[in-house]
Amino acid sequence: MDALVEDDICILNHEKAHKRDTVTPVSIYSGDESVASHFALVTAYEDIKKRLKDSEKENSLLKKRIRFLEEKLIARFDEETSSVGREQVNKAYHAYREVCIDRDNLKSKLDKMNKDNSESLKVLNEQLQSKEVELLQLRTEVETQQVMRNLNTPSSNWEVEKLSCDLKIHGLEQELELMRKECSDLKIELRKAKQTDPYQEDNLKSRDLQKLSISSDNMQHAYWELKREMSNLHLVTQVQAELLRKLKTSTAIKKACAPVGCSEDLGRDSTKLHLMNFTATYTRHPPLSPNGKALCHAASSPLPGDIKVLSEKAVLQSWTDNERSIPNDGTCFQEHSSYGRNSLSLEDNSWVFPSPPKSSETAFGETKSKTLPLPNLPPLHYLDQHNQNCLYKN
């Protein structure tokens, strides 16, 4: 717009200069016509001048308006660009601020943890130093005590220790020699066994079978002895229960109706308990018959439990003999099918505490699960009669 205004001014100036340069012609016409033309030119000039001024004003207004619009557009553009940038800047600032806050918090926590760790380390170091001091004191005390003991120990103790060590060494040497001899003997036997004929091998097998049969017999014998002892225990418990009942009833009616002799007999009977070879025997006075003779006399004696091997014939013969010696009137005992149903009356004259099982009988419990050929066993009623014979043997 400035260029346009300058062009208009230049046109006016050019017209002015052109008017100055133009040569006024010689007026051919009269004076009135020249005056009129001059007046028309002046008016036209003034009109053109006014128009130029108006156009200049309009141009200046337009320039101002254009500048205002340009400034407005620039301000809008700046505002738009600045709003987006400000938001991003604000977001970045907030994020940076949060990161700084987190960093400060973590730093404070780290400082606190470092302080706590340093304090705990100090405490632990102090405790460790105190423990080390205590250990050093204890070590010094122990060392001093050992030194004092070594200084105070007489020569006799050293000699005794030396003699004991020598005896141990001598015993170990003897055991070593015995083991060497046994090893050599076993080697010789092994060589001989390799050189033997098949007949001797059969003999060895038969011997092994005999040993197995003997061990099975031992197991059966131990089983029957255990069964007999269990039946005896059952009988003993029944007798004790009857005695306790009798004692309770007698103490209740003793002052009223029982004579003095009955209590004395009970006391005398209760004290007759003897221990003989790990077997307890209780003996009572037998009841008297009308003729004054004892029906069942003699206390029962336990069978010897140390016999390991018994033949079937001997066992059966002893049982049958004992069975024949039992009276048939049934006054002394009553036969039952198992030891769990045996019973005794208060008139029985003896009962036995069975001896505890011996170490030789432990093989039964250990080899119970093995299957071995068992010999023909006697029937069950023989065992029950044998138990009764042990209790009522004449």
UniProtKB/Swiss-Prot annotation:
Compartment(s): Cytoplasm
Top-level taxonomic group: Eukaryota
Major place of residence: cytoplasm
Signal sequence coordinates: none
Keywords: Coiled coil, Cytoplasm, Phosphoprotein, Ubl conjugation
Residues carrying Phosphoserine: S318, S355
Primary role: Adapter protein which binds TBK1 and IKBKE playing a role in antiviral innate immunity. Activates serine/threonine-protein kinase TBK1 and facilitates its oligomerization. Enhances the phosphorylation of NF-kappa-B p65 subunit RELA by TBK1. Promotes TBK1-induced as well as TNF-alpha or PMA-induced activation of NF-kappa-B. Participates in IFNB promoter activation via TICAM1.
Protein name: 5-azacytidine-induced protein 2
